[in-house]
Structure formats: structure tokens, C-alpha cells
Amino acid sequence: MQLKSQEMRKLAPELDPLRIGTGWKKEDLGKVQVMVESTYGDSHPGSGHLNILVEEVRKGIAEEGGFGARYHCTDICDGESQGTDGINYSLASREMIANMIEIHANATPFDAGVYLSSCDKGVPGNLMGLARVNIPSVFVPGGTMNAGPEMLTLEQLGMYSAKFERGEIDEEKLDWAKCNACPSCGACSFIGTASTMQIMAEALGLALPGTALMPSTSPDLLAFAREAGRQAVRIAQMENMRPSDIVTMDNFENAILVHAAISGSTNCLLHLPAIAHEFGIEITGDTFDRLHRNARYLLDVRPAGRWPAECFYYAGGVPAIMEEIKEHLHLDVMTVTGKTLGENLEELKNNGFYEKCEKWLQEFNKRYNVNLTKEDIIRPYDKAIGTDGSIAILRGNLAPEGAVIKHTACPKEMFKSVLRARPFDSEEECLDAVLKHKVQKGDAVFIRYEGPKGSGMPEMFYTSEAISSDKELGKSIALITDGRFSGASTGPVIGHCSPEAVDGGPIALVEEGDLIEIDVMERKLNIIGIAGERKSMEEIDEILAERRKNWKPREAKYKKGVLRLFSQHAASPMKGAYLEY
């Protein structure tokens, strides 16, 4: 087959000398040319080691007769920007990463691509860009960091910080936690957004089998990176191996069933629909709700479970999860191996993959003096932790387009409740009220004007952690927002409330003392009373209509720059909050 790179060499005589000036040799010019795009940078632990993996990818490309060119667009860290205005840039950065991949790939001719990232916005940004560019491609997950001493992992820092603020621990204990929570590179060691999205990449068939959430310190990760380079060259010379040839609605349904099994981050409801949109496939919150109902929740890993994320790989990773839910999966979907999902799963049973995982698990047991088995981490299908998936889409007069709750991380006491509304127009005000004990048992705390168009849709992590780490509030109040939550968040938190406040959604009309009904099993989120008194739904509709007459749209928060662009063009959270032009 004719390679795009070689056709462009004929049209652009300056291309060869420019390549040579960049370090290519003359004999490299006629090879399969592969763009190796990563989020490498000193931005955070998930990207700091990717340059090492990039070089392994390039070695694999060379071994298969190709040449790999390095491109970088680093990502930001939600953890580093948490609690500051910097977090407002997080979701917008996903769009910019995808845009830079489009620019890099289309401004210069390439025959294939390999993409490397680890974390919250890097992985979905890579997958969106990969779909948009649509050249034969392989994604390489950057792996997970190890847990620290006492199995300390980063999501526990919010709890430590809240305890320190309340005077429950001293500064020395807080400092110990800070110095030991991130002992290596890789994604944070819990099933937050970073880990979830690595798993989604593999579940979609865009990464090599068994590569998601490998420990970043493992030599196996280097070997898989090299194999990804080889595979990119192979599929560049095959017919019908572009991402659009591989990924269908069936692939996305597989991924969502895996999401249910791992109790994945709610941010996946922003990212999978945005990735699907690039493939011309429509996925909404309703798709998640439909597939999560009656799905098995199997993974006993933090934040909803007990163990660090590295244990996920030691128990067999994505393939082990898929084996447990195999009867519900589309096994005939294609993957980047050039084989179907079913063929990949059978091959892993015979190539020593699971035996190697077991060896790593035994080393983990020695390190922490525990005695875990695979079944302690990934439950068998018939011994599932839960049988109703892990998330639910709630609807009602408070969220006509929907809102999301991760019910596996929510106390059962809060599944059906009526609470008093306490609205705040910023997270800072709300967090201050929680820490100063101005929020009481039975309150429904609202943080609004924090949606995509309002402020960029930041995470409400500190507030959610302050609530969930309080023994009384964590089981007696709810946090409802048009913003989003960290993948590490636990407790009675409801996000993505749509339409958002800045668009005049009902969340903007909530007043102090309104009665709020939450019913997770019936998927309801309603205002059912005013000033502490129950009203009929007809009366509520009339009152909200009257309030709307007095509501005034807010002036745009951002006047220029990236956030101005994002706030003007972001789609609804229920669609994925991607840029609509």
C-alpha cells in the first residue's frame, strides 16, 4: 500500500532536508513514519517518566523498520491546581491536547501514531486526538505509581488535611502523609479519573491487552511500550486498521460495562462521550445508566474499596475483569492487535500473562505483609460487591437533563432522603461553611455556577473530602453541584447537574430552605418543598417559574484566553462538555 509520508515527499521537496536537519538519516526518510505523541513533562508524576517510554516505543518502531518522531504536549495535574483558580483550566486542557495532536499529525505527514499518557486529561485528550486524526494508532498507558508506606495513597491527603484543619491530627502527621503519598512516577494509585481512563483505553481496544495500570516501575511496562511501537508499524501497512475501523458503539458498550465493574470515576461521563463524539458516535449519561443497571461491581480498590490501584494489575487487570463479565461483552469487536477481543482474551490465558501478574501479587504481599489473592481484589462474578453498577443518572425538576452520583461510594443511608437546601455560589464559600461547622445534619449543600460555561467545570474535591471525612456529615448531608468531582471523591456527592446554573438551569433557582428529594434507586432529584414545607409538583413548577422571572444571567466570568473560548463553546456535561463550534 502507498504510504502517506512517501506521497508527501514527492509533493514537498523541502521535507527531506528538514527531516535530516532534525536528526533523521537519509535511509530513515523512506521508512514508515510514526508520530510518537506524549504528554511528557515535569508537570506531575503521571507524565514525568513518559520520555523513557517514548524511547522504548521508538526502539520498537525501528526494530519493525519504521522511524519514530517525538512530539510532546504535556498535561496539567488536577491535584497540583486543586483548590485554586488553576483547576478551572483542567477540563479545557483536554480540548487543547486533542487540538495539538490534530495540529501535529496533520501539519506533517505520518503513517501511524503512538500516544502515551497516564492521567485525567492527558488520556482522554490523546484518545480524542487519536480519533480525530484517524491514522493507524496504538495508545500506551503510562501505568500507576506504587503505594507508599502503610499503603498510603494520594487520595487520602484530603482526609488528612481536613483532619488537620479540625485539629484531629498534628502537623507532623500531615507532613508525613505529604512526603510519602507519591513514591514513584505514574498515575495516582487509586481508581480515580487517571486510572479509569487508562482502563477505558484498553477496554475500547485502543491499547495492547493487559497494559492499563501496570506499575510504572515495572520492566514489563518498558517491554509493552516497545511492542506498541512495533505494532504501530505493522498496522500502518495493513488495510482497515484506522481507529474508525476498530471502534464502534459495541466497543463503547464494552468499556462502560468495565467502568461499572471497576466503579470508575464519574469524570468518565465527561470523557467517553467526548471521545465517542470524535468517532461520530453518540453516548450520553443515559447510556451509562442503562448499562450500569444490573451490572456487576467487582473491584475492591480505592477510593470505593480497600486496596491501592497497583493491585488491579496484580489481579490480572482489564483482561481479568473482562473474563468475569465476558457473557455481557461484545467479544467480536476489533482491537489494535488486529484480532478480536475474544481472541485476545484467549491468547492471554496461554502466554503467561496471568502467571506473571500472580508473581507481582506475591511480591506485593511480602512488601506489606499481607496475604491477598486475586479474588480479594477482583471478585468473582457470582460474588460481586454490588449488582447495580456503580453510577446512576438522577433526573427531576432540579436536573431535567440529568445529574450523576457514584452510588458505590455513597452511604446507603443517603440513597433515599429529603434535605434542606443550603445554596452557595462558589466552592470557597461552601468549604468555609463546612469547616466552620455552619453546615448541619440534614442539609443539601449546593455549589453552583461551577459548570463548563460557568467557570470551566472545576472539581469540588476539598469540599467533598471535608464532608465525607466528617463522621456525622458524611452520612447525613449531600453536596450537589453543576461542577464535577475528583475521581477520588467519596460520600453523598451529586455532580454535573444539568442544565448548569449559568444557563439558567433549575440549580440557579434553588433558595435557602427548599426541600430536596434524593432517590438513587428511583433515579430522582427534585425540589419538593419551599421554606421547609412540602408542596405539590404543580406548585413547585409555579414557584420556580416565578423565581425565573427574577433571575438574571451572570456576566461572563472570563473575558479572554482559553477559558473564554471554553466557556463560550462547551457542550452540556451530559454530552461530554466538549467544544461545540
Q: What annotation goes with each model-predicted range?
A:
Residues 105-126, 138-141:
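A short, small-residue-rich loop immediately preceding and capping a beta-strand
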Residues 52:
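Acidic/charged coordination and interface sites in well-structured regions
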Residues 90-99:
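Glycine-rich, highly charged phosphate/nucleotide-binding loops
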Residues 1-46, 55-73, 79, 85-90, ...:
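Catalytic or ion-coupling anion/metal-binding cores of large enzyme and transporter domains
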Residues 49:
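Glycine-/small-residue-enriched capping loops at alpha/beta junctions
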